[in-house]
């Protein structure tokens, strides 16, 4: 009788406390880099249209990741340690472009001049040894991220620096907060993704921003053709069709812990790997290098069979 009462008491506690993980058995929690949320929301919507029983949600990342999640989105090249514990799918690539407040003196001048590597380094980085461009206007304000994040890490690494060497006003929050700060400051300059620089519906530059042209072939000057990349599709076409310089590009990685036992999370991730590519351009992403996604899918399928 005592044993029966103990079992009933234990079951009662479980009912009150719920699952240890805090998630229902078929709930999938996604977190990670916030500028990827719009395209992830599209994937969730499309997946639920054919799997209406699915319970998938995004939990916003703050300074740290949520305590419990199934899938993680990252936007920089990861080191060896996390790769040993997680299975990664590289879904597409994002590119970083210089932008300025459209009313700024900087935008008016450099929408014509464009940025070379020398100007880029002087504008954005603390480097006493970098070659200087004396023509830079005095009245400009650089904005950058405060916390470690994919975009600033990728941006700095491309030019040979660390994130902490990016100069300017550090803004807490996500990448879109840089854009909000810049739009309020008529001296503002920053770097951002194609998806944030261009309107999602029209593909044209977000109102109030100027995308600054850059020296794509590395010859030290910005040509008429390089200045003519005036919308989202033009940039994507240029970046996918040729090897370019002065545009940092990195993969968006979706990952799952190899010990994760949530079958719906694995199923959704595999579905995304099969269906993600058709949405990339509309959200400002480049397709990945040939063969990489196929290789990642094969590794993921192998994990699912275990």
Cite the ranges covered by each PLM segment.
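Ligand-binding pocket segment of bilobal, Venus flytrap-like solute-binding proteins
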Residues: 148-223
């Amino acid at each position: 009788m005592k044993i029966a009462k103990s079992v009933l008491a234990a079951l009662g506690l479980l009912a009150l406390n719920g699952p240890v993980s805090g998630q229902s058995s078929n709930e999938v929690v996604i977190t990670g880099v916030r500028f990827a949320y719009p395209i992830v929301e599209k994937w969730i919507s499309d997946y639920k249209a054919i799997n209406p029983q699915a319970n998938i949600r995004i939990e916003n990342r703050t300074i740290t990741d949520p305590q419990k999640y199934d899938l993680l989105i990252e936007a920089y090249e990861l080191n060896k340690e996390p790769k040993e514990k997680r299975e990664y799918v590289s879904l597409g690539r994002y590119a970083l472009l210089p932008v300025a407040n459209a009313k700024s003196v900087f935008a008016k001048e450099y929408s014509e001049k464009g940025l070379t590597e020398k100007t880029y380094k002087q504008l954005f980085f603390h480097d006493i040894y970098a070659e200087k461009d004396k023509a830079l206007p005095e009245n400009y304000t650089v904005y950058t991220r405060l916390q470690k994040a994919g975009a600033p890490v990728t941006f700095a690494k491309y030019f040979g620096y660390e994130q902490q060497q990016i100069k300017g006003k550090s803004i807490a929050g996500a990448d879109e907060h840089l854009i909000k700060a810049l739009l309020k400051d008529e001296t503002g300059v920053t770097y951002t993704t194609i998806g944030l620089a261009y309107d999602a519906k029209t593909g044209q530059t977000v109102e109030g921003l100027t995308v600054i042209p850059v020296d794509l072939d590395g010859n030290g000057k910005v040509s008429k053709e390089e200045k003519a990349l005036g919308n989202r599709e033009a940039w994507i076409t240029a970046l996918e069709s040729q090897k370019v310089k002065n545009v940092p590009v990195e993969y968006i990685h979706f990952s799952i812990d190899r010990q994760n036992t949530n079958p719906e999370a694995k199923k959704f991730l595999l579905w995304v790997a099969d269906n993600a590519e058709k949405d990339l351009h509309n959200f400002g992403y480049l397709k990945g290098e040939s063969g990489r996604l196929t290789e990642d899918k094969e590794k993921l399928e192998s994990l699912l069979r275990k």
